[in-house]
Amino acid sequence: DFDLGSHSKKQNDLNIKSNITKNKDSNSKLAVQEDGEWVVPYVIEPSAGVERGFLAIINEAYSVEDLEDGKSRVVLKLKPHLSPIKAAVIPLKKNNKEIVSLSKLVKKRLQKLGLGRIIFENTGNIGKSYRKHDEIGTPLCITVDFESLDDKSVTVRDRDTMNQTRIEFEKLNDFLINTIKN
């Protein structure tokens, strides 16, 4: 039992530490001697804040994977419906106007689905873009390349497996809906 009144009386007493000793019978538990008896102090701190739940989700999703080439990658394996960014559309060649404009068109079409945030990634090379989106938990990276101009399809890379699949424009909406919602 703990009396909050006695705690309040000593809250500004900096010498209270001198009354705390370790019980010889306990392995590593701290004990306070009061009237010749040993009492193991305990605190119950109920908390139901959003921060703790968020931290638990982030902690569970964070992982570092060793790759075959000896390097490692950081991955935030959030469930797709929890991920703040649902997909990143990445043009393979940043200075090719046709690829960039097609990438923006793909992004615009996917945003109309209303699944969440779809971003256009136009910085760095493709490998660095993939790693960046692995770290921030983006489940899918959609790459628009030179083949996309001819065959009207894109390469979709899965964050967790790193597998890449070619998907036609007409099937991309359904693929994204199934991946994000399931």
Where are the regions that the model predicts?
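NTP/phosphate- and nucleic-acid-binding module
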Residues: 1-182
